[in-house]
Amino acid sequence: MSSSSGPLSPQSTTATSSLAAKAANPLSSKVTTVLSSSYADTEFREALALLDERGVQNTAETRRQLRLDLQKEVIDSNGEIIDEFAKVAEQLRRIGTTIGRLNETFNEMKTQIGSAQKTTSSTLIEASQLMIQRRQVEQKQALLGAFNTNFVLSEDETAALTLTSEPVDDLFFAVLAKAKRISKDCEILLGFENQTLGLEIMEQTSKNLNLGFQKLYKWVQREFKTLNLENPQIGSSIRHALRVLAERPSLFQNCLDFLAEAREHVLSNSFHTALTGSSPSGIEDQSVKPIELVAHDTLRYVGDMLAWAHSAAVGEREALEGLFIGEGDEIAKGIQAGRDNEIWRLVAEDGEVSDTFDAVETLNELVDRDLSGAARLLRQRVEQVIQTNEETILAYKLANLLNFYKSTFSRLLSVGSALVETLGALESEALRQFRSLARDHVAAIQGDFQHTPADLRPPEFLLGALEQLAAIMKTYETSFTSSSDREEEFEPVLAEAFDPFISGSANMAKPLRAPSNSIFLINCLLTAERSLSRFDFTQRRAARLQAQIQEERARLVETQYRFFRGESGLDSLIVQLEPLGESKEDIQKALLLESLQSPALSQASQKLDDFLPSALMDAMENLKNLQDSRLVQSITEEAAEKFCVDFEHVEEMLILVDEATEQKQNEQDDIQGPRTLFPRTSGEIRVLLS
C-alpha cells in the first residue's frame, strides 16, 4: 500500500498523461470541429436546413444510420444520372446518323451546283453586262427626261405659248416662264465645248418667246379696247400681263401708247358730254347737267370745267395705280430686266447710264396723256372766256383760280406735265388780260387826274381803285400759293392795280400850294394805307406809304410852326434872338436889337395877346381838310411845342436883357425893362396852346 501511495516517479507520470491525452483526443477533436464551424457558412446552413426538411429526429439510431442513409441516397442519385446519360448517348448516336446523311446530301448538291455553275457562268456574265447596260440606259433616259423637262417645250406647251387661238391664261404664263428659264439655262450649255445643242435650243426658245410676247402684246391691246377703268374690279390677268410684258420695254411702251390714245378718246368724249350734255355723236345724256348752263357765271363756269378735269385726273390716276403700281415694283423690275437683256443696252455709250424705270413718273405721264384731249378742249373754252371778259377783278379771279388748279395738278402729276403747262399758259393769259384791263381803266380816267377835289378828299378814281384792289386782295388772301414770299409775288398786281392811281394822286398834289398839297396827299396815302395794312402780304408796301405820310406830316408840322411864328408877331424876334446866348456880348447885342426897343416890343406883345386866344383853333382850321382828326391834333401839338420851345428862348433872353436894363434904370429912371413891355411867360403860352 505504501508503495502504491508513495510519490510517482517521473516516468510513470509521463506515461499516464500520454494515455489520458489519447483517450481524450477524438472527443476534443469533434468538439473543436463543432466549435470551429461557423453558423454563417452557407453550406453548413444549407445542410442544417436539409435535415430540418427531412424531419430527422435526433436519436441515437438516427445518428448511427444518418451517414449510411446519405451515402445510399447519393448512390441512388448517381444511378439515375447514369440512366439519363444513357438516353442522351442514344440521342447523340441518332444525331450523328442524321448529320452523316446531311453531309452526303450536301456533297451531292455541291457536285450538282459545281456542274451547274460550269454550264451557266457565261449566261451570268451576259446577264451582268445586260444589267449594267440597263442601268446606263435608265440613266440616259432620266437624263433625257430631265433635259426635255428643263430645255424643251412640249408640243402642247408650244401651242399654248404661240398660237393665238389658245387663251392667255395661267398655262400660258407658266409656259412663258418656263421658256424664259430655258433661255437663261442655255447659257450653261454654251459653256461646253460643243455649243451646237445650246445654240439650237436657244434659237428655238427665243423664237417661241418672241411669238409668246407678240401674242401677249396683241391680247393686251384687245383688252385695252374694252377696259373700263371706272370699274374698281379690274381683272388680275391684265395686271399680270402688264408685269410680264414689261420685260419687253418696246412692246410695253407701245401698249402704254395704245392705252393713252384710247383713254384720251374716252376722256375727251366724257368732257364734251359734261360740257354739253350730249356725246360728240349727238346722243343726249339725261343724267348729266351740262356745265354750259352756267356759262353766264364766268367764274363758276371755268371752275366747274377745272373741277371736272381734276376729278377725272384723280380717278384716272387711282385706276391706273391698280394696273401699274398696285403690285409693288414688279413692272419696274421687269422693265429693268428687259433693258438689261437688250444688246444695245449691255454696253453704255460714252459712259451713259440707262435711266431707272420710275413707275410713279410713268403713271403721271400716262394720266397727263390721257387728259391731253380734254385739256385742249378746256384751253379753248377758257381762252374764249378770258378774251371776252371785260372786268378787271374777274380777270384776276380767273388767274387766281387757274393758279390754284395749276398748283393742285403740279402735286398730283408733275410740274412739267402738259396739263400744268396748259394751266400756266392760261394763267399768264388771264394775267395779261388783267393788266390790259387795268391799263385801259387808267387810260380811261386820265381826265380825272387833272381835277383835285375842292375839299382835298381822295379822288373818286382812287377810292374806286382801292375798292377794286380790296376785292383782289381778298381773293389772293384765300388763294393757295406755293411762293415763300407772298409780298413779292403780289407786287406785280400792285404795280398794275394800285401804283398808277397813287402816282396820279401824287401828281395831282404837285400844283397845289402848301399846306393843301400835303393835306391832299396825306388823305390819299392814309386811305391807301388803311386798305393795304389789313393784309399780311402788303405790309411792306403799307410801311412805305406810312413813311410817305410821315414825310408829308413833317411838312405840315413845319407849316403850322411857321403859322404860329408869323401870326403871333414873334417871327422876327425869334429870328434875331435865336443865335444869341447868355454871354455878356450877346446880351449887349440884344439890347441894341430894334425888335427889343419899346415901340416894337409893345406892338409884338399886343399882337401876341390878340393871337393867343384863338391861336389853336386858327391853326387847326388850317388843317380842316385833313380827314384824320387825330393826325390834325398831333401835327398842331408838335408845331405848338416847337413854338413854345422858341418862346422859352425868347423869354430867357428877355429876362437877361431885363436884368441888364435894371442896371441902367438906376442911372436913368425913364428906361423901361423888356419884361414890363412884354409880360407873357412860356407857361402862359403852353396853357393857351394846349
Curated annotation (Swiss-Prot):
GO terms under cellular component: Golgi membrane; Golgi transport complex
What job does the chain carry out? Acts as a component of the peripheral membrane COG complex that is involved in intra-Golgi protein trafficking. COG is located at the cis-Golgi, and regulates tethering of retrograde intra-Golgi vesicles and possibly a number of other membrane trafficking events.
Give the location in the cell.
Golgi apparatus membrane
Q: Which GO terms describe its biological process?
A: intra-Golgi vesicle-mediated transport; protein transport
What residue stretch is flagged as signal peptide? none
Keywords assigned by UniProt, alphabetized: Golgi apparatus, Membrane, Protein transport, Transport
Name the chain's protein: Conserved oligomeric Golgi complex subunit 6
Give the start-end ranges of region Disordered: 1-22
The answer to keyword Transmembrane helix applying to this record is no
Alphabetized SMART domains for the sequence: COG6
- Family of the protein in this entry: Belongs to the COG6 family.
Q: What is the protein's membrane topology class?
A: Peripheral membrane protein
Is-annotated flag, keyword Protein transport?
A: yes
